[in-house]
From Swiss-Prot:
GO terms for biological process: tRNA modification. InterPro entries: THUMP_dom, THUMPD1-like. It holds the Pfam family THUMP. It comes from Drosophila melanogaster (Fruit fly). This is THUMP domain-containing protein 1 homolog. Transmembrane segments: none annotated. Residues 1-24, 67-104, 275-324 are annotated as: Disordered. GO terms for molecular function: RNA binding.
Length: 324
């Protein structure tokens, strides 16, 4: 039998650990149907990737839409100064029995602050994807694609990506559950916005992580049929599509978006936009051509020297035969 003192200590530790979870394990935001935002990928250091996403999105959102102002922000009241000096000097001291009123006021103020924080809507909020090296930033903006295009165009023109860990930053228009009925329903509403009016060329880009139920051929076939049903003039173009349908499946969730000139913009790869590989490839091609020309010149010189040596050998043979 264990002593009572030891049992009491164990009970206190268990109680302390249970209370500790409330403070040290904050409630995480998770993906939900109907959300929109930005899907980012990285190789290492997800925390740094999230921080860079916040910096990028807030920087360009402030440029486009202005700085973010919290809703229902309380106005700070400044104390009025009396004629004789500070306002606090002439205030009467609270009576001894007024402590309960002060406590009630503090509780009411704390409850009001909690209510304001719960009602406050942040412009960008990190959402847990439960997928390695995949980050999703939820947004309250109506059109995340417009902000994404502005970021990409600015990086392409200036050549400065302002990021080190973020590889791709793709705007997402809708989130749904990763099953075919929900995907077709969400895609149908989305395609009404992009494929109804004028015929265009399109391509489907599908990626899946930690999900084997959604098959590539199945989803591509059904989405292509859905696009053609919106407008018969829509055609598939895998190399130079004007509109790209982005389908990212993360475990039990599917992220959908339709983006113009996605392939021209290096698939929204920030590093590729800041440092285009075309320049590197052209430089490498010039160096390769120069080395090939040098090699060809050396080969010609070697061939000519070998021919001269052969002719010298033939002359020596003829002279020896004449001597004999």
């Amino acid at each position: 039998m264990e002593p009572a003192s030891k049992k009491s200590k164990m009970g206190k530790n268990v109680k302390f650990n249970n209370n500790k979870k409330k403070y040290f394990h904050a409630k995480r935001q998770t993906l939900q149907p109907g959300q929109r935002g930005f899907f980012a990928t990285c190789n290492i250091n997800e925390k740094a990737c999230v921080r860079e996403c916040y910096n990028l999105l807030n920087h360009y959102a402030d440029i486009l839409y202005g700085s973010e102002k919290p809703e229902n922000e309380p106005e700070k009241k400044q104390p009025e100064e009396g004629a004789g000096g500070d306002a606090g000097e002439d205030d009467p001291k609270p009576a001894a029995g007024g402590t309960s009123d002060d406590d009630d006021d503090l509780e009411a103020a704390a409850a009001k602050c909690r209510e304001m924080l719960s009602q406050r809507k942040m412009r960008f909020q990190n959402v847990d994807t439960n997928t390695t090296n995949c980050v999703f930033i939820r947004t309250q903006l109506e059109d995340p694609v417009a902000l994404g295009k502005h970021i990409i165009n600015d990086i392409a023109t200036t050549g400065k990506s302002m990021s080190r860990f973020v590889l791709r930053l793709v705007p997402i228009e809708v989130v749904c559950r990763a099953n075919m009925p929900d995907i077709i329903t969400a895609a149908g509403e989305l395609f009404d916005k992009h494929f109804l009016k004028e015929p265009t060329s399109y391509g489907i880009i599908f990626n899946h992580r930690y999900n084997q139920q959604i098959k590539r051929d199945q989803i591509i076939t059904q989405l292509a049929e859905l696009v053609n049903s919106k407008n018969v003039g829509n055609k598939v173009d895998l190399k130079e599509a004007k509109k790209s349908i982005i389908v990212e499946v993360l475990r039990g969730w599917c992220l959908l978006s339709v983006i113009d000139n996605y392939l021209e913009c290096k698939k929204f790869n920030l590093a590729e936009l800041a440092n285009p590989s075309d320049k590197k490839s052209s430089g490498e091609g010039d160096s390769k051509s120069e080395t090939s020309e040098v090699a060809n010149g050396n080969d010609k010189e070697q061939a000519e020297s070998s021919e001269e040596s052969k002719s010298n050998d033939d002359e020596n043979k003829d002279s020896t035969e004449n001597d004999k």
